[in-house]
Amino acid sequence: MGNVNAREEANSNNASAVEDEDAEICSREAMSAASDGNHVAPPELMGQSPPHSPRATQSPLMFAPQVPVLPLQRPDEIHIPNPSWMQSPSSLYEEASNEQGIPTMITWCHGGKEIAVEGSWDNWKTRSRLQRSGKDFTIMKVLPSGVYEYRFIVDGQWRHAPELPLARDDAGNTFNILDLQDYVPEDIQSISGFEPPQSPENSYSNLLLGAEDYSKEPPVVPPHLQMTLLNLPAANPDIPSPLPRPQHVILNHLYMQKGKSGPSVVALGSTHRFLAKYVTVVLYKSLQR
């Protein structure tokens, strides 16, 4: 047993010595080739590597493989898309503010699945679809002041809202009427009573109301109904002057002229509106039978 171990140790020592000699020979040949300027290895060393040579060991993978990407662009070549839905709210508000008109809500509350509206505001060219809001359908339109005709299209059929102002044409078709006017107080004196009193607080009292406070009777008719077209004072009786625009509260009422008719004739008048025009019909009736 002792001889066998001695032989194995001797063989291993001889093998290591041979390997060291081979490594030294390779290093010497490489140094001589580098000094001579010849970088080509000998033919016997091209196909094999000596043991423990740096070419025999492979370096581990130190970095993960990179995914190819597009090269960066210069600032002047970068294109940024600008779709309509990415616009800022301020720009949308500026576009809406540039549109002049009166905001108007049009509502349909008589059922249906698909509701649209068309009108004379664009000469009946387009149909606008209403959006469902609970049980009703609504749409917001910004229109200039004026009188418009419009109608609803409910599930493909022409309809009109009976609770809204309406008119009929010569063919018997019914349309709704939309009257948009810039609000101006018609009777400036009527709003003076709502102004706060210009008096100091020390002048207020808590006295009880007297009998004279309850003796004043209310007017028989509203004051704006007394100035009808029949009772307007004429600037020049010989030259007929153009009539002013009638107030909307006197439309579709029957009025009697005061004191200008003869004792046997009475004048009755009524004013109607069609679009932006006003028509007043005066009927002179004899009191004699």
UniProtKB/Swiss-Prot annotation:
Which residue windows does the record flag with biased composition (Basic and acidic residues)?
A: 1-10
Query: Pfam families under this entry?
Result: AMPK1_CBM, AMPKBI
Family matches, as SMART domains: AMPKBI
Lipid attachment in record (N-myristoyl glycine): G2
InterPro entries (alphabetical): AMPK1_CBM (IPR032640), ASC_dom (IPR006828), ASC_dom_sf (IPR037256), Ig-like_fold (IPR013783), Ig_E-set (IPR014756), KINB (IPR043554)
Q: Which residues form a coiled coil?
A: none
Query: According to the UniProt record, where is the region Disordered?
Result: 1-59
One MF term in the entry's GO annotations = ATP binding
Where does the UniProt annotation locate this protein? Cell membrane
User: What is one GO cellular-component annotation here?
Assistant: chloroplast
Cite the entry's keywords alphabetically.
ATP-binding, Carbohydrate metabolism, Cell membrane, Fatty acid biosynthesis, Fatty acid metabolism, Lipid biosynthesis, Lipid metabolism, Lipoprotein, Membrane, Myristate, Nitrate assimilation, Nucleotide-binding, Ubl conjugation
Per the record, the domain comment is: Kinase-interacting sequence (KIS) is specific for the alpha catalytic subunit interaction and Association with SNF1 Complex (ASC) is specific for the gamma non-catalytic regulatory subunit interaction.
Q: Which family does it belong to?
A: Belongs to the 5'-AMP-activated protein kinase beta subunit family.
- Function of the molecule: Regulatory subunit of the probable trimeric SNF1-related protein kinase (SnRK) complex, which may play a role in a signal transduction cascade regulating gene expression and carbohydrate metabolism in higher plants. The SnRK complex may also be involved in the regulation of fatty acid synthesis by phosphorylation of acetyl-CoA carboxylase and in assimilation of nitrogen by phosphorylating nitrate reductase.
Q: What is this protein called?
A: SNF1-related protein kinase regulatory subunit beta-2
The species this protein belongs to is Arabidopsis thaliana
